């Protein structure tokens, strides 16, 4: 043991033995450390239980496959006689009219091609294709209202048919792709004409034009009015008479005048034929007076149509594109060629129509040709309608201005240039009354206000007379007007003689200071018809003398009749030195051929001396004007028609005087000769 122990550890003799001794003690260093090692207390280890395993949701099984059925091929259906239009095509979005608006029109489609596409529905009157290139919109006008209705229905039906064709073609293509590589030809199930309602092979859409863009005159609506039928004649009897000329849409009786009856045709050509055949025809002992109805007056009734406007309104450029065809004239109106040149307005007015105008207007004659009775057995009421439509704005414009001016005394007098008229509406000529009185018929259309056409007033007031105009020039103007009017009456009247134009009173108020008129004058005609003829010839016409820019205005005077005028000027004296400044009467009446000398109606008082007038300041112009003349005005003198007119006469006298005269008789004859030479009536 000792050998083994000594030799193994100390003398390294037992090198082959294990160097580690399992029985050796733990080694601790002999040197004391500053922080002696402390044995840690015994720790207990408590392991946590393992978490429960996660529950994995099972994946739902995929849904069973659903097979989409292949759409069956459309079955071929035989055409059925009871075929009806689809419900969508029967919807009408506006009031039916003869104007049809087409949209989605190919931009390169010409007018003739559009007319050719619409011709299967009925006769086409006109086509407006001005907006096709920019908006694809065209307006087609038909003669027959039923043709327009068929066109709207047919075009919409064709449009819906094309949409259904697309669906059928898609279904056929899907079925062909699943079965065979080639497409079978589709079988259409609607009996139809493939080209009906297509424009250049393209489907379009149609709707009726807006009511505000459709012409409202009788010629465009096929509407006639019978003015003097027997009140006992029923609408059924009248329908049978007019039914011989075409299909009648409606016959109704005027609520205000039982003798006036309205007849509306489906076709405007039938209405025109009935007008020419029945106007002036004897029926039950009475001559019929047939004419086109006039346009409706603007108002709440007209504006009430707004709720019926189509969903797709007419483009703005189409609203002014309508150009109604001129209605055939009721009778030829030859221009009068009497003794030399009828010089109405020789030194008065420049007619608005040119020298080359024909028909109802002759040179210088103006509208006077409308008053005469038409030839060929036709009633004068037809010419009355033409005259009323030709100058429909002559009385309405002053009426609107008078409403703005606040009645009868709102305007300033004098030249009336650029100012609003202020006379009362009761002194204005009413156009329906004027036309009916000129034609000798008391009946009027229901579209106008129910006013009596038997106006008995004969005294008129001529306004806006150039201040250099004298009584001699005014007499010459009236004489030529009477000559021309009477020549037309003699040339046209065959059955019923109308009263000739003549006058028996004339007064041109003068400013006694500057010897110039104050801008207005008074004339009493011998008949209401003559007053209407003077109004129609001179109203709203420019003057042609002294380079004046004034526009003539003609109204009724406040004092009416020769007897009332004589009573008005009774016991009056004017402070003037010439009879030319006085109101004058003519006995017998003067008509241009019978040149009755004027007889002063009042006396003259001594005029103030010129020396005293030159040294003293000028008096007020209102004091130098006859106050009785101001009372003849249609409005009180406070309105400016009297004194204000006189106060402005000085300025207008200088403006209208191109001859350098200051008034009086000195420039009258010379001015008349110069004007006649300038107009070509003298050498």
Swiss-Prot record:
Disulfide bonds: none annotated. It holds the Pfam family RRM_1. Residues 98-177, 223-295, 458-559 form the RRM domain. Highly expressed in shoot apex and inflorescence apex, at intermediate levels in roots and at low levels in leaf blade and leaf sheath. Residues 294-417, 596-683 are annotated as: Disordered. One of its GO terms (cellular component) is nuclear speck. Disruption phenotype: Plants produce threefold the number of leaves, and leaf size and plant height are strongly reduced compared to wild-type. Shoot apical meristem (SAM) shows a higher rate of cell division and internode elongation is significantly reduced. Some inflorescence branches are converted into vegetative shoots. Keywords: Developmental protein, Repeat, RNA-binding. SUPFAM superfamilies: RNA-binding domain, RBD. Residues 404-416 have a biased composition (Gly residues). Residues 328-340, 379-403, 605-624, 637-651 have a biased composition (Low complexity). The keyword Metal-binding does not apply. Residues 659-669 have a biased composition (Basic and acidic residues). GO terms for molecular function: RNA binding. InterPro entries: EAR1-like_RRM3, Mei2-like_Rrm_C, Nucleotide-bd_a/b_plait_sf, RBD_domain_sf, RRM_dom. Plastochron is defined as the time interval between leaf initiation events. Probable RNA-binding protein. Involved in the regular timing (plastochron) of lateral organs formation. May regulate the rate of leaf initiation and the duration of vegetative phase. Seems to be redundant to the function of PLASTOCHRON1, but to act in an independent pathway. This is Protein terminal ear1 homolog.
